[in-house]
């Protein structure tokens, strides 16, 4: 890559990083292109050299950051660990994003997942759920997970729990420090995996037998 191309990419990244900070602080709809340019320390006109509009900036922020998460989650599925450990890794990846890049999480939760244009991105947003479903199905096939649960519903429940925790941190409803993130990982994963277990199925069947007896 030439020196000019490298400088251009660095400037583009500088603008995107600034946009994340501005969107996280002010919200997408109340932010102006000028706010992003000022945060990035570039001329207003230079921003339009890289992006045609504020909407394109947001779309790029989503596509690049979400893409990184999807790559990491897909890498987990491609491994040979037991399904329960794969689900644990997926939860850790998603929840620890809050510790590493909280502003990115704020933008993804507030400005992307709950925006009026969410239907335009639904295919990308549901990909983690599809991966989780695939992991659960493999766990059922191996006998690690109970066979009487719907993997599609179980995947939505698993991902939904993580999404609600992230939303709670974004909205300030819960503390999101290191200890709280670690506790959330244990709680979400251990509680749900206990419900997915074959032992839980056997216990449920025994209780139903007692009731019907």
Indicate residue ranges for each PLM-predicted region.
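Short, basic, alpha-helical segments at the C-terminal edge of helix-turn-helix-like DNA-binding modules
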Residues: 63-68
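All-alpha amphipathic helical-bundle segments outside canonical DNA-binding/catalytic cores
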Residues: 85-89, 120-126, 141-157, 179-183, ...
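Short coil/turn segments at alpha/beta junctions that flank glycine-rich nucleotide-binding fingerprints
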Residues: 25-29, 80, 101, 142
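Hydrophobic alpha-helical segments that form the core
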Residues: 95, 149-171, 180-195
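Short secondary-structure transition hinges
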Residues: 96-137, 144, 152-153, 171
């Amino acid at each position: 890559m030439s020196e000019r191309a490298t400088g251009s990419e660095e400037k583009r990244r500088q603008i995107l990083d600034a946009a994340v900070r501005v969107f996280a602080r002010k919200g997408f709809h109340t932010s102006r292109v000028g706010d992003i340019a000022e945060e990035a320390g570039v001329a207003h006109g230079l921003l339009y050299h890289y992006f045609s509009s504020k909407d394109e900036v947001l779309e790029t922020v989503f596509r690049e950051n979400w893409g990184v998460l999807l790559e990491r989650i897909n890498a987990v599925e491609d491994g040979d660990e037991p399904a329960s450990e794969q689900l644990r890794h997926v939860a850790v990846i998603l929840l620890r994003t809050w510790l590493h890049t909280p502003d990115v999480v704020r933008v993804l939760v507030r400005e992307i997942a709950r925006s009026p244009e969410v239907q335009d991105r639904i295919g990308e947003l549901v990909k983690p759920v599809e991966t989780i479903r695939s992991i659960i199905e493999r766990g059922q096939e191996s006998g690690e997970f109970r066979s009487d649960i719907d993997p599609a519903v179980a995947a939505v429940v698993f991902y939904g729990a993580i999404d609600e925790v992230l939303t709670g941190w974004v909205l300030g409803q819960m503390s999101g420090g290191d200890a709280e993130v670690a506790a959330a990982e244990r709680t979400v994963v251990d509680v749900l995996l206990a419900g997915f277990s074959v032992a839980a199925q056997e216990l449920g069947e025994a209780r139903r037998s007692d009731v019907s007896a």
